[in-house]
């Protein structure tokens, strides 16, 4: 099959969240199954210095009344064909943000559709998150191109319909409130990035006001778990580590722990219980829970904590405050650094993911691969990947809690700290975690089956009256409504 991946991110060049890892790692796993898989992303300014890009494009056209060009290069790791949509709107190095974000990604979706129609024509166009959400709408009546839409994070839903109608061509048959909604309605298959998240988003608690719509399309909704690249993330061969190690010879972790403690300004104590967190510093990731329990944990246990990431300024400031209160025991590094992230996975004893919601999560898979035991909330993909430790049966791979409450998180942390003090049992726990196999090969087979189901098949148009039942609607420009109210008050 010919498959084109369209996304706003692609690791390692363009990565903010887990979507970048998926778009980088899933295509080569599919290519190993014999498929012709290619990728298309916006031609962000920084890519021209990172990749070998020919000066002449392979395709020129117009989208939304503006000229664009498509350049062909190769992905630096997989060597798969990588297409870049060149346009001045993508010249800045930023990926997200800015007043033009809605226009930029709607334009990217439009340019991708033009490219798929008139240049390299895929059988399956695999779209990722709202940035590509209009593509399934435009492809809905093309019998030669089927669409798959992957939900990485339902919280981010893109521009409302009234704004889409101002920016671009919206077909007469289009239903739905915003870009995320129309993508789910018109894609031939929709999938979430874990089985549990696929179920959760059909409930009011996690559905982000789209649970009614998701139940309406549940017949074409799937849950496919993400994986990790086992070659890239391999503690036996990882060149970023001071000492390599494996499940059968775990001694190298001691050297990595000492190196991490030294580099982060922590007291170099081999027996301290070292906890790590890597990721976006936002409420979704449960950083506020960590802030509420950290002082008590540090007061009553011999723990140390290291945090790596960037995010909301209030959370960053609160983490800095903890670092100043507990020098040598709490460290924070406000950036993303691949080398440091690998050292945290390889040097910490446990890894923290107390998420409010978690579509899949990659970090817990990497932590287990490197022998750092996850302490997670039972939500989303964390349910599918981390099983609770049972010391009496010597089963499980981590420590889990249910409610998003400080006391529940703290209790899980104390249980993990107590387990850490029983070193032989802890080593067996580490070995169980390290021998889990969440490779992309398994996920690729599931995606391949979904592609086979959908290839050459077009879903019927959604019923307008049924869709209207699920509208939460901002169906007109709010500024126009204000203007009408003002006129009536005169």
Curated annotation (Swiss-Prot):
The keyword Oxidoreductase appears for this protein: no
Residues bound to ADP-alpha-D-glucose: 15
EC number: 2.4.1.21
Catalysed transformations (reactions): [(1->4)-alpha-D-glucosyl](n) + ADP-alpha-D-glucose = [(1->4)-alpha-D-glucosyl](n+1) + ADP + H(+)
Function: Synthesizes alpha-1,4-glucan chains using ADP-glucose.
Family: Belongs to the glycosyltransferase 1 family. Bacterial/plant glycogen synthase subfamily.
UniProt name for this protein: Glycogen synthase
Gene coding for it: glgA
């Amino acid at each position: 099959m010919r498959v084109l991946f369209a996304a706003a991110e692609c690791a390692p060049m363009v990565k903010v969240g887990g979507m970048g890892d998926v778009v980088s790692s899933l295509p080569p796993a599919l290519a190993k199954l014999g498929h012709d898989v290619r990728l298309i992303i916006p031609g962000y300014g920084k890519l021209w210095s990172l990749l070998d890009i020919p000066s002449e494009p392979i395709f020129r056209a117009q989208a939304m009344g503006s000229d664009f060009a498509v350049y062909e290069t190769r992905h630096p790791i997989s060597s798969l064909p990588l297409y870049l949509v060149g346009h001045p709107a993508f010249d800045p190095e930023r990926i997200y943000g800015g007043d033009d974000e809605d226009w930029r990604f709607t334009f990217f979706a439009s340019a991708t559709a033009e490219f798929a129609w008139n240049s390299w024509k895929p059988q399956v166009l695999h779209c990722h998150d709202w940035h590509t959400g209009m593509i399934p709408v435009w492809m809905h009546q093309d019998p030669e191109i089927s669409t798959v839409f992957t939900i990485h994070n339902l919280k981010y839903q893109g521009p409302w319909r009234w704004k889409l109608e101002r920016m671009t061509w919206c077909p007469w048959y289009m239903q739905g409130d915003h870009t995320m909604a129309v993508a789910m309605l018109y894609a031939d298959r929709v999938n979430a990035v874990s089985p549990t998240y696929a179920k959760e988003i059909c409930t009011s608690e996690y559905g982000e006001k789209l649970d009614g719509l998701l139940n309406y399309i549940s017949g074409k909704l799937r849950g496919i778990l993400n994986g990790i690249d086992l070659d890239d993330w391999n503690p036996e061969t990882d060149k970023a580590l001071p000492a390599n190690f494996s499940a059968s010879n775990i001694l190298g972790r001691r050297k990595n722990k000492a190196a991490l403690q030294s580099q982060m300004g922590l007291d170099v104590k081999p027996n301290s219980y070292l906890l790590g967190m890597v990721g976006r510093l936002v409420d979704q990731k449960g950083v506020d829970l960590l802030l509420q329990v950290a002082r008590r944990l540090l007061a009553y246990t011999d723990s140390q904590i290291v945090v790596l990431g960037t995010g909301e300024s209030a959370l960053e400031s609160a983490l800095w405050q903890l670092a100043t209160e507990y020098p040598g025991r709490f460290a924070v590094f406000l950036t993303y650094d691949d080398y440091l992230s690998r050292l945290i996975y390889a040097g910490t004893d446990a890894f923290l993911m107390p998420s409010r919601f978690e579509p899949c999560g990659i970090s817990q898979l990497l932590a287990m691969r490197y022998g750092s035991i996850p302490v997670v909330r039972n939500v989303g993909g964390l349910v599918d990947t981390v099983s609770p430790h049972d010391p009496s049966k010597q089963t499980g791979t981590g420590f889990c809690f249910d409610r998003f409450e400080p006391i529940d998180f703290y209790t899980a942390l104390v249980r993990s700290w107590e387990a850490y003090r029983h070193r032989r049992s802890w080593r067996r726990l580490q070995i169980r975690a390290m021998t889990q196999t969440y490779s992309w090969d398994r996920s690729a087979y599931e995606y391949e089956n979904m592609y086979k189901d959908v290839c050459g098949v077009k879903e019927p148009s959604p019923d307008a009256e049924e869709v209207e039942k699920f509208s939460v609607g901002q169906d007109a420009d709010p500024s126009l409504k204000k203007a009408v109210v003002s006129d009536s008050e005169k």
